[in-house]
A protein has these predicted regions:
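Feature captures C-terminal
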Residues: 1-132
Length: 132
């Protein structure tokens, strides 16, 4: 549902809910670390089917909450199959994303836009550096 054609290989990985939260927390810390020298920039992970809340001013480990898949809470110990296009493990290679997208588009007679899954931001009202 949501992708960027910037990294070539697609992957499918098994991850626990706790692992997913840890990854989102780490990416969030790259953006919102209170020490500007540790802010690495970038953007939050684009996710399909997953919704969550993000509180940028909270401490590392407490920024991500209310993670849900298709409206149901994510279980910390439950394992989920996660598809991606930017492998996080060394030596992982899958089919190039542009081939996956091409196959998917060809299999449909009509493609309609879907609602983007954007994180719900908490505590950013009045912050001119964060666009909501």
């Amino acid at each position: 549902d949501q992708t960027a054609i910037t990294y070539p290989f697609t992957t499918v990985t098994s991850m626990t809910g706790e692992m997913i939260k840890t990854i989102l927390e780490d990416v969030c810390d790259n953006l919102f670390n209170p020490d500007p020298y540790l802010q690495q920039g970038g953007d939050m992970v684009r996710v399909g089917g997953l919704t969550y809340a993000c509180e940028p001013s909270a401490r590392m480990g407490s920024r991500i909450s209310d993670m849900r898949l298709k409206g149901q809470p994510i279980g910390a110990a439950k394992t989920y199959r996660v598809a991606g296009w930017a492998p996080v493990a060394e030596g992982v290679k899958g089919e190039p994303i542009w081939d996956v997208v091409e196959t998917w588009l060809k299999s449909r007679k009509r493609v309609t836009p879907r609602r983007l899954n954007l994180p719900r931001l908490i505590g950013v009202e009045g912050n001119p550096g964060i666009a909501v």
